[in-house]
Amino acid sequence: VAGTPIVEQLVNDIAGVVNQPIEEVAFILGDPAFFGQEIVAHLTKFAENLGAKASIYRQLNPLGTGHAIMCAASILEGPTVVAYADTLIRADLSLDPTADAVIWVKEVEQPEAFGVVQLNEENTIVNLVEKPKEFVSDLAVIGIYYFKEIEVLKAALQEVVKQSLQEGEEYQINQGILAMMEQGKVFKAGKVNAWMDCGNPEVTLQTNAAMLQFKKEEGETLVDPSAIMENSTLIPPCFVGKGARISNSTIGPGVSIGEGTIIENCELQNSLIQNQDRKSVV
């Protein structure tokens, strides 16, 4: 979205605000048939550009977030951020030194659709409930977590994944977190200024528009100098990638056009056009 792959945008955002060097980035990918060597090479280079080592792990069976984390069990050591790859944020991810872990949350209008946390007066999380049928809290878990010693979560999840699953059940990170809370580990809540989901096409388009606006306000260059505009109007904010060619078209707002893409005789708003694509008379 907004010219950057979602997972790269997420890691960049985290790296930019945690104020600590990142030594290693572990990517949990699915079946190689869908996440092949080209993707692995791209992610490896991306991590190296951050000055970090890249590690690739596979979750071949979609058995939940807790199971996904345990796919990378061999490197679960020390201070670690866990983040879901369909989430983008704007936040100060400063870490509370008194906390064993931090869960970032955002107020939402429909908390029954999310996992939510309850806090006490000291901003300590005292309960975590997944998709409550009755009102518990409006602070939704956004899918970014910090663990001072992720070995503790690993040990908890090792016990979780020993359990047999009933049909439709999964191993969830929440099970490990609740076990840690029972051990007396202190979880604090972190707040985000903006939380943007990329879990389905509709919300991804909304996220694209929001990220374009953020980048515009932050002064980022959104139109590559090599892009060619012929008899066309660009209504910002829009992203236009390297080598793209736009002719006889009106583009924007909220449009991202990938590298090498050709747009002809089109009117586009709130759209995502991938690299090396071609659109005519839309």
Model features per residue range: what roles?
Residues P32, N61-P62, A85-L88, V108, ...:
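Short glycine-rich anion-binding loops that position phosphate/pyrophosphate groups of nucleotides
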Residues L88-S164:
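Conserved core of the sugar-phosphate nucleotidyltransferase
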Residues E159-V282:
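Left-handed beta-helix
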Residues K53-S55, T124, V186-K188:
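Conserved beta-strand segments of alpha/beta enzyme cores
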Residues T4-A83, L93:
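Conserved N-terminal catalytic core of the sugar/cofactor nucleotidyltransferase
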Residues A26-F27, V82, A101-W104, A189:
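Structural beta-sheet core signal
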Residues A52, L76-P79, T98-A101, G184-K185:
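Short coil/turn connectors at secondary-structure junctions
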